[in-house]
Amino acid sequence: MSAPRPILRSSILAAGNGAPVLLLHGSASAAVMWVPAIDVLKAKFRVIAPDLVGYGRTDSWPDGCDFSVEDELRLLQPLLPREGPVHVVGHSYGGLVAMHFALAGRIALRSLTLIEPVAFFLLPHAGAHDAWMEIRALGDGYAAGIAAGETEAALRQFIDYWAGRGAWDAMDETLRAQIRRSARKIVLDFQVAFTDPGLEAVRALKCPVRVVSGGRSRAPTQHIASFLADALPSAEFEVVADANHLLPVTHPDMVAAMLLRELAE
C-alpha cells in the first residue's frame, strides 16, 4: 500500500470565459509570471494559472517526503473541467509538467504548447552527450550546494546559468527572497526533469503540439526543443531568435500575442 500523499493548499490566478487554458510557470517562479498573457487571453478563454508545488502561495513540499511529478498533477486536475478539452501551456519546468499532464491522458487536450521545456531526460535519446553532462553538472551541483547549506551560492549559479552572468546579484532583493524560499523545491524539479518516462510514451502524444525555443538559450534546452519537434510528427516549431530561456519574462507581449494567435486557430 502506498503512503498517503501530503495535502497542500494551492493558489491560482484565473480570469475570463471560454475554452480553458492552463498556464504553468517554471522553477523559481510563480503564476504571476503569466499576468501579461492572462490579460490578453482572458477576452477569449478561461485562463487558469496555478502556483506549482512550493512556489508562490502554494504550500511547500514537506522535507523528507518522496516527490514525483504525480504530486504536481494531483493539484492541477481539480482545476479543470472533468472531460476537457483544454489548452495546456508550460514554460521551463512548467513545460515539463505540461508534458507529463499530456502523457497522463486523464483530460482531453486541445493543444500543448511547450516553451523551453526542461525535459532533460530526452538529451541522451537525442545523442546530445555534452549538453546532458552540462545540465547534470548544474543539477547535481545545485543539489549538493543546497544540502551543504550553501543556498546563496547554489541559487546564484542556477539563476546566472539561465538568465546570464550577474543576474542573481542584479535582481531585486524582494524577488531574491521569494526565490530563496523555494530553493529546496528546485532540487525536486531537477529530479523530475532527469526521470525518463520513456521515449515511446513521448512519441505517442497525439494532440497538436507547439514547441518554442529561445535562439540565445542554453544548449540543453535548444537540443530538447529541436528533438521534440523532430520526434512529434504533428509538432510546430518556433525559434525566437533574440530570446534566451526566460522568454515569457523578457518578451511577455510577444508571448501573449503568440498564444492568442495560436490558441485561437
Spans of model-derived segments:
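Glycine-rich His-Gly loop
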Residues: 23-26, 92, 214
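Conserved hydrolase catalytic core segment
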Residues: 85-127
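A catalytic-pocket lid/entrance helix-loop region that shapes and gates access to the active site
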Residues: 118-147
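Catalytic histidine-centered segment of alpha/beta-hydrolase-like enzymes
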Residues: 240-256
